[in-house]
Amino acid sequence: MEHLKKVIISKRAELAAKGGHPWIYGTEIEHADEGIEAGDIVRVESKKGKFVGSGFYNPHSKITVRIFSTNANDTFNAAFWKRRAAYAVDYRLQVMRKEDYDCCRLVFGEADQLPGLTVDRFGDVLSVQVLSLGMERHKKEFLDGLIEVLRERQLAVSCVYERNDVKIRELEGMQQYKGFYRSPLLDPAAEKTRVDIVEN
C-alpha cells in the first residue's frame, strides 16, 4: 500500500463512487491535502475517513479526481499497470471471436479502470489516445506492459501510434500532438503500415 495524499469527498460523491461512478467533480471535494500536484494519484476518503478509492487528481479539470482502483492495498508500479493491461486483453480474448480480435478496441477508458485511455488494435498496430493527465504520466509503464502482455499471448505488435491531437487534452492541461510511440520495423510492409496509420 502506497502512502498517498488524501482527498475527502462529500456524502453524495461517496455514494456515487461506491455505486461504480469513477468521477469526482471539484464541487464534491470537501478537503484536499496540501502539496497535491496535477496528475498525482490520491487516496479518496469519505468524510468519516473510510477508503473509497485511489484516483488521478487534476485541479484544472471539472472532473477533479478519476478513480481507477478500489483496492486499498494496490501499489501503483509497473507490475500494477501490466496487470491492468492483462485484464483488458484477456477479457476481450474471452468474449470476442478470434477473427474480430485483429480489429478491436483493446482499452476503453473507465470501463477498463484506465481513465481517459483508449487503445485500438488494427492487426499488429496499436492506436492510442490519452485524455487524462494522470494517465499521461503513467502511459509509458502501461504501454510497455501492454506490449509485453500481447507478445506473451503470441499477438504481434509492430508499432504504437499516438493520436493525441484532440482539443479536450487542453482542458486537462496537456498539449495536443500525434506521432509514433513505438516505430514500426523497417521493412516494406512496415513502411506501408507507417503511411496508412499517419494518413488515416
Where do the language-model regions lie?
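Non-catalytic accessory regions of SAM-dependent methyltransferases
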Residues: 1-123, 152, 192
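Structural motif
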Residues: 41-42, 125-126, 158-160
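Short, conserved charged micro-motifs
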Residues: 77, 136-140
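Non-catalytic substrate-recognition/targeting regions of SAM-dependent transferases
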Residues: 109-114, 118-120, 140-200
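A short interface-forming secondary-structure element
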Residues: 123-137
